[in-house]
Design a protein with these regions (language model features):
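Terpene synthase/cyclase
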Residues: 2-566
Length: 566
């Protein structure tokens, strides 16, 4: 059931009877007393919060440097001039690719769109020009697909031999293999040429590492980085830092000096914005005080903020990040109530109260649930229906657990795409959009296509990483166990099938993220894709949310605290 999970062990839980206050609309104070003697419940020992408010407030927040601001503006115009300078098509593609991987493409959205539109209009001629250039063809294909332009996999047919297979000699070109590999992960359903290209490129890149075919350490690093995770699946902000530092290490990197300096300054300036936001939401969370009153739940304010940076890192999306962080905190707390602490009777009452969204309906709830409902009610009143849907999905899984029921795989996944909280997340992204219009509001129901595979991917990533720990505490059977029981296969086979399901759902996402009719639709689809990428980061090989030390702590430092050296 868990959106985020942790390793568990028995926990002795007791509340002092002390008042707890929740402030509503800055004027009304709603008061509730914490319960004195809880019922017999399941419990968990979660790792403690690593980022208390004192630690966050101690972080150095750089004051705005007018000299640095002026330098950023100057470099931005220099880069814009470089974009508009006459250049060969391959140089143009390389520049656009660098703008995206360096994390500064958002400054030049219109310039990039105009350039790609021009290239797309001449696609047939350019493809002929690149008849022997696999690297350039693959970059062209990837950039067009990534930015919503229609381009067929047929662009790679010219690299096949008389038997219809990719020519073996192509494997000797590591740069071409890297570009083909990255392009292949933008495949859609039933694109066999791209599927074969993915297998071909993967095999040859593995040989590069295993047989020492490349003498350059940096080239081997790039190959290992790609094989660990393709660009299309990576959390953008994490890759941006890696790519900037990779360009710094590579003396011969073919990156414009002004562009690289601009990318470093922009990264650090954006990080300062994030740091200030983190301090603000940390103060809100501390003053709210609910984490102290409900200690059975995971306290993950900083990690919840990191999720939002993965979804929309640009400074202009500050309001979304702040409000979504608050929602993430409540999702975690509600998830732990359903997974760990609440009795079935209490959960049914709580679900009904959330569904009714009536402040007068809380009298029948136990005191700890009153606290939780009031916190959610006072903070997130805009997304009422989505919170109700989430709690209903949680309740379904709670009933499965209490009845000892193992659902069919499809039944589990259908409910799981709701209990993973995707709809709550996307609703916040929708409501906090910068360019939201009445027309966009009227079209809200027009975006379900990309949401279905997105929600399934989130559930699959979560279950693959957290199921072992959750089952140890006696949680409901996960998709792996449902698959094992229904199909009569081993856990290893079931996990393999889940990984194939991940690829299949990514193909659906790629098919649904094509052409857009407005900047708002473009923003929403990009937000959804970035949500998937961030889920992948938090559940890559292990539960990096529940076990918040290790890699997650490292990336908090990398993205939110330590600036790039200039």
């Amino acid at each position: 059931m868990a959106l985020f999970a942790a390793s568990l062990a028995p926990l002795n839980l007791s509340f002092d009877r002390r008042p707890f206050f929740l402030r509503r609309c800055a004027t009304t104070v709603i008061r509730c007393a914490a319960e004195k003697t809880p019922a017999s419940r399941r419990s968990a020992i979660y790792q403690p919060n690593l980022w208390g408010d004192d630690r966050i407030r101690s972080l150095t927040v750089e004051e705005e440097d007018r000299t640095a601001t002026a330098r950023i503006k100057l470099l931005k115009e220099k880069v814009r001039k470089v974009i508009h300078d006459d250049k060969e098509v391959e140089e143009q593609l390389q520049l656009i690719d660098q703008l995206q991987q360096l994390g500064v493409a958002y400054h030049f959205k219109d310039d990039i769109k105009d350039s790609l539109s021009s290239l797309h209009a001449s696609l047939e001629d350019i493809s002929l020009k690149f008849k022997d250039n696999l690297h350039a063809s693959a970059v062209l294909f990837r950039l067009l697909r990534e930015n919503g332009f229609s381009v067929s996999e047929d662009i790679f047919y010219k690299f096949r031999d008389e038997k219809g297979q990719l020519r073996d000699c192509l494997g000797k070109n590591t740069q071409g293999m890297l570009s083909l590999y990255e392009a292949s992960y933008y495949e859609k359903d039933e694109e066999m040429a791209l599927h074969e290209a993915m297998e071909f490129a993967t095999e040859h890149l593995k040989n590069v590492l295993e047989e020492g075919m490349e003498s350059s350490d940096l080239t081997r690093e790039k190959v290992a980085h790609a094989l660990e995770l393709p660009l299309n699946w990576r959390m953008e902000r994490l890759h941006t830092r890696w790519f900037i530092e990779s360009c710094q290490r590579e003396a011969a990197a073919n990156v414009n000096r002004a562009l690289l300096e601009f990318a470093k300054l922009d990264f650090n300036a954006t990080q300062s914005v994030h740091k200030k936001e983190l301090r603000q939401v940390s103060r809100w969370w501390t003053e709210l005080g609910i984490a102290r009153e409900l200690p059975f739940s995971r306290d993950r304010l900083t990690e919840n903020y990191l999720w939002t940076v993965g979804w929309a890192s640009e400074p202009e999306h500050w309001r979304f990040r702040e409000e979504q962080t608050k929602a993430n905190c409540f999702v975690t707390m509600i998830d732990d109530v359903y997974d760990v602490y609440g009795t079935l009777d209490e959960l049914e009452l709580f679900t009904d109260t959330i569904d009714r969204w009536d402040i007068n309906a809380i009298d029948g709830l136990p005191d700890y649930m009153k606290l939780l409902f009031l916190a959610v009610f006072n903070t997130t009143n805009e997304a009422t229906l989505k919170w109700a849907d989430l709690c209903k999905a949680y309740l379904v899984e709670a009933k499965w657990y209490h009845k000892g029921h193992t659902p069919k795989f499809d039944e589990y996944l259908e409910n799981g795409r709701m209990s993973i909280s995707s709809n709550v997340m996307v609703t916040y992204g929708y409501c906090m959009a910068q360019e939201l219009t009445k027309h966009d509001l009227e079209r809200f129901s027009d975006y379900p296509a990309i949401m279905l595979p997105k929600s399934r991917l989130a559930r699959l990533y979560d279950d693959l990483a957290t199921s072992k720990d959750e089952l140890k505490r006696g949680d409901v059977q996960k998709c792996i166990q449902c698959c094992m029981l229904e199909r009569g296969v081993s856990e290893d086979v079931a996990r393999g099938q889940m990984k194939e399901a991940i690829k299949a759902n990514w193909r659906s996402v790629n098919g649904d993220r094509g052409s857009v009719s407005s900047s708002f639709e473009e923003y929403m689809k990009r937000l959804v894709v970035n949500m998937i990428r961030t889920f992948q980061f938090f559940y890559q090989d292990e539960d990096r949310y529940g076990k918040a030390d290790g890699e997650t702590e490292n990336q908090v430092f990398s993205l939110l605290i330590n600036p790039i050296l200039l």
